[in-house]
Each structure stands twice: as C-alpha cells, then as structure tokens.
Swiss-Prot record:
Protein name per its UniProtKB record: Palmitoyltransferase ZDHHC4
Native source organism of the sequence: Mus musculus
Domain DHHC, chain residue ranges per copy: 149-199
Subcellular localization: Endoplasmic reticulum membrane; Golgi apparatus membrane; Cell membrane
Residue ranges annotated as motif Di-lysine motif: 340-343
Highest classification ranks of the organism: Eukaryota, Metazoa, Chordata, Craniata, Vertebrata
Membrane topology: Multi-pass membrane protein
Keyword NAD: no
Sections of the chain in a coiled coil: none
Domain of life: Eukaryota
Length: 343
C-alpha cells in the first residue's frame, strides 16, 4: 500500500475519532465501552506498566504543569520554521504577493499576545473579598446551581455558574473549562482572550494551509506536470493523475507536503472547536453547563425524593439575553471595584 493511501487512512481515522468523541461525549454508552475496553486491557497488561501509565496520565491531565504549553509552542515553532525556511522562499521565487506571505506572521503576533493573556490572566478566582459581589452577578436556577451551596474545599459560597477546578484548586466565576494548552482555567474574566486566541490560531493554520496549497498548485501549473507521462509497473506509459502527482510532490517536497497535511487537519479541528465556542458565546452558555445540562436535574444536592408522577426539573438557560448582550457580557465582564477605606 503506497504512502498516499496510508496517509489518507490516517487522516480519516483521526477525524472520525474526533467526531465520535464530540458526538458521543455525553453518552453513557461510550463510557461503558471505554471502561469495558480498559478492563479487558488490564487483564493482559502487566501491573507495573499499568501503574506507570496511570501515573503519567494523572500527571498530564490531573495536575497543573506547563508541559502542554511547551508542546504548543514547540509545534507552532516547527510549523513556522518550515514555512519560513522553505515555503516562503519558494513562494518569493514564484512571485507571490509579499503581504499575502506575511499574513501568517501578523496572525502569529496577535495570537501570541492573546495566548499570553489567556495564560496569565485571572479567570475569575472567587475569594473572600469578591464573594459577595459575584453572588449577585447571576441568578440561581436551583437546578444546576442551587442557592446557599458552599465549596467544601475553598469554604466559600458558590455563585451561580461557578465551579471548583481540581487542577488549579480554586473556585472560578462563570467556569467554562480548564484548558491544558494554556495551563489555566477559562472563566468570566479571560474568556474574551481565549476566543481571540482561538480565532487567530485557527486563522493562522488556515492561512499557512492556503499559502502552501497555492504554492504546490502554482508549481504544478508552471512545470506542466499534468501533461507528463510515467512508466507504470508493467511497463506501460500512463498519463499523470492526481494520485501520482501527490506522490511525486511528496518525494520532491516531503516536508512541505507533510506540513500541508498537518495544518489542514489542524485547521479543520480548530475550526470545529471555534464554531462550538462561538455557539456557546452567542447563547451565553459555558462548556461546563452544556456538558451537564441534560442531566443536571438529577445531580442536585441535597438529594430529594422524586415522585414518578412529578415532572423532572430540566435545566434551562436563563442567562441568555440576546446575541449582542451575550457577547457584551463576555467581552465586558462584571468585575468588582475595590475602594480604599477612609480613615
């Protein structure tokens, strides 16, 4: 099986896995399948190896550390290094427009600014000083966010839409999720930075993919490769087709073709997640609320007896006040003002 088929199978497998995870992330069946597979594997994998893998996974996904920030910057650096060293130079030889070639660098500069802000900004940490203020920002729905509930770890009253982050060990106002790529929680006060960071990251990947694809197409057009022929395995001359052309380009420019495949997949994944994040912003939901929304009524505390004849209390989004108001709330979040006490 040639390289192109294997590469396409790899891309298809990766995309299918991501789509299935997104679709069935709220399904109990998926959890049962994963747990069943883990139990089967535990019978054949040595205990020492299992403990090592569990320790590694715990360190990666259940503790706060900068590993994914380093990985993020490393991958971004490798992509831009390849773009600068090869794609940019070849495109200049083919007389591409300079502003067009510099656009990825502009997007990178903006992206790094908002990446830093997302990493460093306070997501909305709840403290004794701002507890009373944050309790008044959002209404309690008494389903997902009951009144008078306290965080047993922080010993603070929990404002509506807040959540305690296990990795950061703090309660976060309007908690969305903990992002390992920025090593920080995404909350009320840094969601705006996160959205712009995600938007510029998607745009930079898509721009590099577009420039790289345009270079390869220009190269094929200039060299008239479509008019050439090649000798097949049985000794017959064949006209150049798309499959042969891609394989030829990979042999001639392996790093550029691999870069193109990587940024195309990355652009698709980022674009999908960006659309999801924008949907949540437009409807004034958080990832935490979206994930728990379908069964939040049965997770209330304290637990109460439920009569079969009574209708279950389903979570409803009471915080959406229209598209403009929802976006204004994200980009101009409510923050407490601290005044010095006069003597």
């Amino acid at each position: 099986m040639d390289f192109l088929v294997l590469f396409l199978f790899y891309l298809a497998f990766l995309l299918i896995c991501v789509v299935l995870i997104c679709i069935f992330t709220k399904s109990q069946r998926l959890k049962a399948v994963v747990l069943g597979g883990a139990q089967v594997c535990s019978r054949v994998i040595p205990q020492c190896l299992q403990r090592a893998v569990q320790t590694l996974l715990h360190q990666l996904f259940h503790t706060r550390h900068p590993t994914f920030i380093v990985l993020h910057l490393l991958l971004q650096g490798l992509v831009y290094a390849e773009y600068t060293c090869e794609v940019f130079g070849y495109c200049r030889e083919l007389e591409f427009s300079l502003p067009y070639l510099l656009l990825p660098y502009v997007l990178l500069s903006v992206n790094l600014v908002f990446f830093t802000l997302t990493c460093a900004a306070n997501p909305g940490t709840i403290t004794k000083a701002n507890e009373s203020f944050l309790l008044q920002v959002y209404k309690f729905d008494d389903v997902m966010f009951p009144k008078n509930s306290r965080c047993p770890t922080c010993d603070l009253r929990k404002p509506a839409r807040s959540k305690h982050c296990r990795l950061c060990d703090r309660c976060v106002h309007r908690f969305d999720h903990h992002c390992v790529w920025v090593n920080n929680c995404i909350g009320a006060w840094n969601t705006r930075y996160f959205l712009i960071y995600l938007l510029t990251l998607t745009a930079s990947a898509a721009t590099i993919a577009t420039v790289t694809a345009a270079f390869l197409l220009r190269l094929v057009t200039v060299s008239d490769l479509y008019q050439e022929t090649y000798l097949d395995d049985v000794g017959h001359f064949q006209a150049v087709d798309t499959v042969f052309l891609i394989q030829h380009l990979f042999l001639a420019f392996p790093r550029i073709v691999f870069l193109l495949g990587f940024v195309i997949v990355l652009s698709m994944l980022l674009a999908g997640y960006l659309c999801f994040a924008l949907y949540l912003a437009a409807t004034n939901q958080t990832t935490n609320e979206w994930y728990k929304g379908d069964w939040a009524w049965c997770q209330r505390w304290p637990l109460v007896a439920w009569s079969p004849s009574a209708e279950p209390r389903i979570h409803q989004n009471i915080h959406s006040h229209g598209f403009r108001s929802n976006l204004r709330e994200i980009f101009l979040p409510a923050t407490p003002s601290y005044k010095k006490k006069e003597k």
